[in-house]
Structures are given as C-alpha cells and as structure tokens.
Amino acid sequence: VYDVAIIGAGITGCAIAYELGKYNVKAVIVEKENDVSVGTTKANSAIIHGGYDPKPGTKMAEYNIKGNVYTKELCEKLDVPYKQIGALVVAFSEEEKKTLEELKQRGITNGVPDMEIWDKEKLLKEEPNLSDKAVAALSSPNVGIVSPWELALALAETAVLNGVEVKLNTEVSGIEKENDTYKIETNNGVIEAKYICNAAGVFADKVNEMCNEKTFEITPNKGEYYLMDKSQGNLVNHVIFQCPNEKGKGVLVAPTVHGNLIVGPDSQPSAANDVSTTKQGLDFVRNTALKSVPGINFRESIRNFAGVRARTADHDFHIYEDKNNKGFINIAGMQSPGLSSACAIAPDILKMLENSGLTLEAKEDIVDERHIDRFKHLSHEDRAKLVEKNPAFGKIICRCETITEGEIINAVHRPIPATSIDAVKRRCNAGMGRCQGGFCGPRVQEIIARELNKPLADIPQDRLGTNIITGETKDGGAK
C-alpha cells in the first residue's frame, strides 16, 4: 500500500512528487501516457507570469506570486533553462491605457514588484520592432521564460532519485474507498493508497467523479501556436502581450529559452484530447500577432501545435480536500497561470496531507540538485574534456541544435528513461531545430533501440501507437 498516489504527471503532479521525495513517504505517480509532461505541460506559452493578471484574493493570485519566485529558485538548482526577461502589456488606444492602469493597480494589490507604465518613446526604444501604433505599455520585469517539459522532468527525476515511483502507461478507470484505503483501478491492476492527489489536468473532473460528488467541471479550451525558427528569435526582447480580454491574456509574441520565437495562442472550446491545429485558429493568431510585431516573417515557422487548458467556470484553481472523502485532494483547473503556480502549490499540498493525517518525517539525505551536460553551451576546453572521457560526445547527431550522441544516450538512461523519439527531444533538444527531426529522427530512433535493446519498429515517435516503422522490408515488410 502506498501512502500517496499522485494521478497525473504534468507539472503539478511532478512538483508534488518532488516535495514528497524529501520525506519518508511511499509515493507513486500514476500517468496514462508513456512519459511525463506530455499533456498541457508540453504545449503552452512557457511563461512564468508576473502576477498582475489574476483577480486579487484568488488562489491564482496567491500562487502566481509565490510561484514566480520559487520556480526560478528550482530552475537554478535543477539546471533547467530559465531566463527572466520581463513582460510588456502593450496598449494601442487611450481606452487600453486605462486597462494598463487597472492591471498595475491589481499587480500592486497582489504584490508584484517594480511595475512601471512606459510611454511610447521608451517602449519603442526598448522594443524597436513593435508596431508604431502602440501608445504605452505596462512593464513587469519579474516575468520569466522557461522550458516547461524540462522543469517537469527535472522535478519528476529528482523525485525518483529520492524514492518516488512512477507508473507510466497506467490509466485510472475507477476509484473505490475501503476503510482508510483508496483502491485505484487501472489497466495495469489495482493500486492501493491511503491518500490521493488528483492532478489529472483536463481530466481532473472525471477522476474526481470516480469517487466524489461532482463539485467542479472542466471545460477544455484549446490554444494554437506558431513556433518560429531562431532567425526570428531576436525580434523582441520581452514577452509581448496585448491587453487582456474575457478570453484570457490574448496572443503573445515571446522569445523562448532555446532562442526561437513563440506566437500564440487563440482560445476556443475543444475536446479534452483535441490538439489539432486549424487554418482558422492559426490565421487568427498570425493576424493578431502582426498588430503587435508587424515584422514577424511567418514563412520562418518551423512548427504549429496546440495545447488544451483546463478551464473552470470561476476561472480559479480548485485546490481542496474532498469533504466526504478524507485524504482525497483535488488540484484542478490549472489553467494559466498554472505553470507559474504549480511549484508553489506543491508545498501546500503536503501541509494538507499532513493535516489529514499523513506523517511527514524528513529524510536525512536527499538529492536536491542536478547537472545536465549540454555540449553546445560548453567551452572548447570543456568539450574536449568531455569527448576524451566519452567519445560519444564527439559525434553530432542533431545538426540543427548541435546535440551529440552522448547527450541522446544520457537521455535514454535518465531516471525516467526516454523510450520515444519525442521523449529524447524533451530531454536534450534533439529534433527541436529547423528541420524538426527530418535529418536526425531516424538516427535517434536507432540509438534508442540499441540502448534499450528493442526492435527498431517498437520505438514510437511519441505516445504509444505513434509507430513510424512497421517492420524491416527484407524481413517481409509490414507486420
């Protein structure tokens, strides 16, 4: 019997697992996909928000502010790409200037530091590629950009090194309570746990209703994006927002930590698993973004993608212990600023577990930092040392991103192994560049198959079932 079962291995579930790993607790993450961070966590704007947007007094406001600080600390400690570049909310009319004042006041109430309203002159000096129709902007220098999947992986891997188990390809189909123990039915048998943390993202309402009365409903909301080549990465220096509206923070234009430019999202109701992109959605994103930054060359787009947000009617996080089922804790409605808030929510979940009866006895010895060898960021001297120690680091596999065979082998053998081409991409960036794996994809697939001692046909692109190869032609071809 586990002490705690965490359902869902997105950023929220991984953050809770990371915190639980510091204590003598038997914990497990249960995830239906074949890797962590493959839902909303891998498909969002990758922004650590400032905290001026949420309504004062909400859980969003509280945790966004705390998370803005704590997430940065964790990224430094766990070697996760993060840059504090600040954000600008741009106004294009006198009416929108009033919105900037309202946002600034809201930010002051929430505790956001160092905000300023810039006039047109200062704005265009700092951001020369902005539209000259911009009249003013709210500056929030505490805003950061991050690699969301690398953060979730860092938290989950550290948790694993500290004794937390991860069960992938394990889908929850039912939950029953017997005495003080929850019996979680899955496609891989029954998992027993004294406490449940429901961090199931867009499916959190369904998981909640397996055991509890319906207390909230998630309305999945899809957002579509462009990812631009690095040739566009220096167009803006800050995260550029337009004034928010009832649909959310609107279409942003921002650098990424890897040097690209991200543009999006729109906002439309969708099915929970609908990550398709549409001409209508992408046209809207493109036309709206060009109002802010008219010089974006959309011919330099290297990928389109969509992510689904877990929206709730009251636009706030639902973080509470069920009143009828002791030890069942919901962490739901984790829409924006969910990524910014998750790391700060996790320590409070541990307090809730403790108040519900879980004994938290700190471990004497834990892993709480990590280092990743990123070949392209090393000096020539350090590269030479690494190649001498391990010749696989002297062989470039992904030319676009300068990723070596050594990095790919390391990705396959990390605490949560990479078993698909995209799982390697999330761990070391192979396949993230201009050709999107067109050149290195087959070579990465061969390395994974070799390292895991599996047939090449068993290595998928991403999720289970996304197989690329059906068999060897000389062996009779397709199975």
Predicted regions, residues:
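Short beta-strand to alpha-helix junction loop
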Residues: 62-65, 90-99, 138-157, 275-280, ...
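Iron-sulfur (Fe-S) cluster-binding segments and ferredoxin-like electron-carrier domains
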Residues: 404-415, 438-456
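Glycine-rich FAD pyrophosphate-binding loop
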Residues: 22-42
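C-terminal catalytic lobe of FAD-dependent flavoproteins
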Residues: 248, 257-258, 273-396, 403-414, ...
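Dinucleotide-binding Rossmann-like beta1-alpha1 core, especially the glycine-rich loop
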Residues: 46-126, 250-251
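Helical element adjacent to the flavin cofactor pocket in flavoenzyme catalytic cores
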Residues: 138-195
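Flavin-dependent oxidoreductases
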Residues: 15, 175-180, 184-264, 268-278, ...
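N-terminal Rossmann-like FAD-binding beta1-loop-alpha1 element of flavoenzymes
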Residues: 2-29
